[in-house]
C-alpha cells in the first residue's frame, strides 16, 4: 500500500469521530444518576451534603489515576504499577514530613511527583524504548515498587501527628459546601487532559497510534515519544495520587492502596476507554470512577462482604469489555458499509 494511502487510512479512521462528545458519556452519566438515586434509597445519608463530599473524596484517588492511565489505554497499553506507585509516594512523602516538621503541602506534592516521575520514566523506557509488552513490564514494576515500599518502610507506620498541618487542612478544604479540594483538582486535571487529547496533535496522535500501531509507525508518527510521555504522565499522576491518599486517610503503612490497580482499570474501561485502543475519553474515565465508587457505596450500605464487592468489580469489568467488543464490531460493519456505498 502506498505510504500516502496508508497515512490517509490512519488519519481518517473512526477514531476522529470518537473524539467528539459521545452518547456513551451521556449514557454513563444517566447510569451514574440512577446509581446515585438507588444508593440514596438504600442509604438516605448518601444524598446529603456529607454523603456527596464523602463520595467525591473517596473517588479522588481512583479518578486521578484513571485520568493518568486513560491516554495509555487509548494507545493500546496498560499500566499496572500505579497502585504500588501510590503506596510508595504516600509513604515516602509521610517519611519526609515526619523528619522535616516544617514541610509545606507544596513540598509534599513536589516529592510525590518526583517519585511518580521516576517510575513513569522506567516504565516508558522499557515499553517505548525496548518495545516490551506493557502488561509484562508494568506487572514487573508493580512488584518491584511494592517491594521497595516494604523495604524502605521497614514496618514503620505514620499517622496524622507526623503530617504537616497545611496538608491536612488542604485535605479538609471544601468549596461550595460539597466540593472537596482533591476532587476540584480532579476536575481541573480532567478538563485540561480532555482539551489536550482533543485539540493537540499529540492527543490526536495517541488515538491514531491506538487505532493501528503498525500503520502509525509507517506513516512517521512519533510513537516512541508519545508512548514514553504517556507513561511518564501516568507515573506523575500516581505520585500526586499518593499525596491525595495521605490527605484523605492521614496515615500510611506499607500496604497503602495495595491491590487497587484493577479497580482503576475497571473504572477506565467502564468509562468507555476500550482496551483495544483508539477510543475513549478522560471524561468517561472519571465518570466510570464515580460510577464504580457509587456502586461500591451501595454495596457497603447493603452490608455486602468485601470479597463480593471485588467480585462485582470484576464482573463489571468483563461486561464493559464485552460491550466494547460488540460496539467495535458494529462500528467496523458500519464503516465497511459506508466505504462500499462510496465506491458504488
Placement of each model-derived feature along the sequence:
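Transmembrane alpha-helical segments in multi-pass inner-membrane proteins
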Residues: 238, 248-314
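Transmembrane helix-bundle core of multi-pass membrane transporters
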Residues: 134-199, 226-229, 248-257, 333-344
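Short loop segments and helix-boundary regions at transmembrane helix junctions
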Residues: 14-20, 73-78, 117-160, 196-201, ...
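Helix-loop-helix "hairpin" substructures at the membrane interface of multi-pass membrane proteins
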Residues: 103-112, 118-123, 127, 175-252
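Single transmembrane alpha-helix segments in multi-pass membrane proteins
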Residues: 33-101, 125-131, 268, 272-282, ...
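Loop-to-transmembrane alpha-helix initiation sites
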Residues: 105, 134, 178-186, 227, ...
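Inter-helical junctions in multi-pass inner-membrane proteins, predominant
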Residues: 42-54, 149-156, 174, 196-203, ...
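Cytosolic-side transmembrane-helix boundaries in multi-pass membrane proteins
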Residues: 1-37, 218-225, 299-344
Amino acid at each position: 500500500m502506498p505510504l500516502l494511502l496508508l497515512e490517509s487510512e490512519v488519519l481518517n479512521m473512526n477514531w476522529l469521530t470518537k473524539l467528539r462528545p459521545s452518547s456513551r458519556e451521556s449514557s454513563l452519566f444517566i447510569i451514574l444518576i440512577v446509581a446515585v438515586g438507588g444508593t440514596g434509597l438504600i442509604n438516605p445519608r448518601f444524598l446529603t451534603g456529607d454523603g456527596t463530599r464523602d463520595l467525591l473524596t473517596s473517588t479522588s484517588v481512583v479518578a486521578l489515576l484513571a485520568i493518568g492511565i486513560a491516554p495509555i489505554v487509548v494507545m493500546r497499553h496498560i499500566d499496572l504499577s500505579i497502585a504500588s506507585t501510590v503506596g510508595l509516594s504516600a509513604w515516602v512523602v509521610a517519611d519526609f514530613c515526619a523528619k522535616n516538621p516544617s514541610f509545606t503541602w507544596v513540598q509534599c506534592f513536589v516529592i510525590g511527583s518526583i517519585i511518580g516521575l521516576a517510575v513513569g520514566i522506567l516504565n516508558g523506557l522499557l515499553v517505548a524504548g525496548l518495545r516490551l509488552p506493557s502488561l509484562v513490564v508494568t506487572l514487573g514494576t508493580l512488584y518491584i515498587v511494592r517491594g521497595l515500599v516494604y523495604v524502605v518502610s521497614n514496618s514503620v507506620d505514620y499517622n496524622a501527628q507526623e503530617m504537616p498541618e497545611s496538608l491536612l487542612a488542604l485535605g479538609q478544604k471544601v468549596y461550595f459546601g460539597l466540593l472537596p479540594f482533591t476532587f476540584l483538582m480532579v476536575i481541573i486535571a480532567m478538563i485540561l487532559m480532555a482539551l489536550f487529547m482533543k485539540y493537540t496533535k499529540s492527543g490526536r496522535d495517541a488515538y491514531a497510534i491506538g487505532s493501528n500501531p503498525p500503520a502509525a509507525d509507517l506513516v512517521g508518527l512519533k510513537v516512541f515519544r508519545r508512548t514514553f510521555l504517556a507513561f511518564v504522565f501516568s507515573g506523575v499522576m500516581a505520585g500526586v495520587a499518593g499525596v491525595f491518599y495521605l490527605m484523605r486517610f492521614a496515615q500510611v503503612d506499607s500496604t497503602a492502596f495495595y491491590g487497587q490497580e484493577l479497580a482503576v482499570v475497571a473504572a477506565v474501561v467502564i468509562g468507555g476507554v476500550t482496551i483495544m485502543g483508539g477510543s475513549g475519553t478522560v471524561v468517561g474515565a472519571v465518570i466510570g470512577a464515580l460510577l464504580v465508587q457509587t456502586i461500591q457505596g451501595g454495596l457497603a450500605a447493603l452490608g455486602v462482604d468485601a470479597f463480593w464487592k471485588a467480585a462485582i468489580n470484576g464482573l463489571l469489568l468483563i461486561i464493559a469489555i464485552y460491550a466494547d467488543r460488540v460496539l467495535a464490531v458494529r462500528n467496523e460493519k458500519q464503516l465497511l458499509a459506508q466505504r462500499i456505498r462510496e465506491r458504488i
